[in-house]
């Protein structure tokens, strides 16, 4: 799947879950399960509850996503 096929949303981290998973409430009021991207893990970027994030999702499964950016 190429980068162009991904769908991007903005949201807020609602809950921290085990195994570096997060429950994210999107701006359109949907709640999804998300994990951090590899570059965020590599650079040790912390994501806490209440943080604004960008989430990348595949059109095939709109209940899971990948956090690609944390806003300051």
From Swiss-Prot:
The keyword Ribonucleoprotein does not apply. Belongs to the IF-1 family. The keyword Signal does not apply. Residues 1-72 form the S1-like domain. One of its GO terms (cellular component) is cytosol. Its main location: cytoplasm. It comes from Acidiphilium cryptum (strain JF-5). InterPro entries: NA-bd_OB-fold, RNA-binding_domain_S1_IF1, TIF_IF1. Pfam families: eIF-1a (PF01176). This is Translation initiation factor IF-1. One of its GO terms (molecular function) is rRNA binding.
């Amino acid at each position: 799947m190429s980068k162009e096929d991904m769908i991007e949303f903005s949201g807020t981290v609602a809950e921290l879950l085990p195994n570096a998973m997060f429950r994210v409430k999107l701006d359109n009021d949907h709640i999804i399960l998300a994990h951090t991207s590899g570059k965020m893990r590599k650079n040790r970027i912390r994501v806490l509850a209440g943080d604004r994030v960008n989430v990348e999702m595949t059109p095939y499964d709109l209940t899971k996503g990948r956090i690609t950016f944390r806003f300051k």
